[in-house]
Amino acid sequence: MISLSDIQVRTLRLRAQRLTPQPPGAETSVAQVVKDLCGIQAQEAPAAALSIRVRSAGLVAADVERARVEERTITRTWGLRGTLHLLATEDLGWLIPLLGPVFIAGDRRRRAELGLNEDICMRAIRVIQDALANHGPLTRAEIVEQLALHGIHIEGQARPHLLYRAALEGHICLGPDRDAELTYVLLSDWIGQKHRGLPLSDDDAHAELTRRYLNAYGPATPQDQSAWSGMPLSKTWAAWQSIADQLIEVEVAGAPAWMLKARAAWLDELPASTPIVRLLPRFDTYLLGYQHRVLSVPPRYAKRINAGGGILHPTVLVDGRVAGTWKSKRLKNYLEVAVEPFDQLVPEVQARLEAEATDLARFLGVQTTWHVLPPH
């Protein structure tokens, strides 16, 4: 078994995550970035766009919305961990049938508490489908009005849980925003059957999810994949065993981990001689892909990144390890970026940070100013 140093592990993961410079000729379309990562968490659309920015070259924020609303090569719906994601549209044919039943079952008790029994859910979803087919896109409030017209009165938190169920069953997804408000559309109308990809058997879908996970996050473990996907560990273990001939076992921090055999050549490549510095946004997938973050976040600063409540703050990443946080303020056509490092930054890292801040402003189409606060 090959034993990897922490630096080697972080270097491999950075490359898998598209956080190293892309080789000449590499495809950097929005859809390709999303597919390579097997989804990008997107409960905050601006943060999801910035996750794409940091993994591409030359794209701008408008390209992300164009890919979602006009080209429809990516779709915003509920996916991994039961949270909103940008997913490659061509992956929906196997991802939704794989993930949906697990999260629908996991939400059963909460639906019951909210008065959403199976009969109500089935009747309400039929009404939603008809309403969107005839009048969509519709906002949540407009959907609630349509339900009321059919004698189905849904209040409070029952509303998002009903829409969540409808999305996990593959009936609906998010459509174009209307005056900064979310709208919903019929998935079949929005993307068309031919664009959602082919379904897979349950076993094949689990195996594909494992390959895609390791493609973006390896070296890693089944426990890491289970935490990232929200799928049962037993199913994940079975999937790993089914593709064992495609994996290499390595040692990470004294414990076994795995990566794809197709990535074996990466083990012989040295880490970059210059620092790789990235400004990761809130909820970036680099920090969501593992059971623990000890390799990427210094333990004494963990609460600076995640103080609780599921919030992951924007981070400064230096060679795969979080070296601080950052925040930005939008002032008309100006972006003010403030970096809060954990320790003093060397000049070379500061120079890379300036390049990142400049590219962030380019992506957003604004001018920028940035400064580094004293370490704390």
Feature-to-residue mapping (PLM):
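Long, low-complexity intrinsically disordered regions
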Residues: M1-V294, P298-H376
